[in-house]
Amino acid sequence: GTEDGMKELKDRIRRDGKIKAGNVLKVDSFLNHQMDIKLFEAIGREFKRRFADAEVNKILTIEASGIGIAKKTETKNIAGEVYTTKVESFTHGRIYDIIVSKEFLGKGDKVLLIDDFLANGNALEGLAQIVKDSGAELVGAGIVIEKGFQVGGDMLRAKGIRVESLAIVDSMDEKTGTIVFRGDDSDE
């Protein structure tokens, strides 16, 4: 069924995710550095299924940290006007400049944001602002792992942004290594 792929994702996070001080969840072993192609395909299919009603024609992502869901292209020197925003990533602990060429994004585009993590929502907020500035329509955001105990998800949803997170971590304990996912007890 549709849940299988995401159960696999949660199992992988439980098995291979490392909890570090300061609410950091390391999933480099399968999300960032060593891409698990099967898992990525499952993730891609799930996003496609969830946003099937939305006629997405553009996908915007930030510093795809090795994420194969949205293919990363080499940065070219962009001629002409660009949209730009600075965002601070909680997950990666640094500030990014996001630059999108105006010829890439505009009226009539239906844009889906994709990111590996949603923590405090700064990165996605920056991307959402670019979409808004361009006159394109923001269809929503597809997140692989949302930290439900941080403010990002609630903030973005409160702004009316459709956020689809494949795994929502409600709590994680550095000492015991325990990760609790939303909906663990009940299937929503």
Describe the role of every protein-language-model region:
Residues K58-T61, L113, V139-I143:
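Short catalytic-loop micro-motif centered on adjacent basic/acidic residues
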Residues A42-T91:
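Conserved PRPP/pyrophosphate-binding segment of the phosphoribosyltransferase/PRPP-pathway fold
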Residues A52-N57, L105-D109, L113:
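Short helix-loop-beta connector
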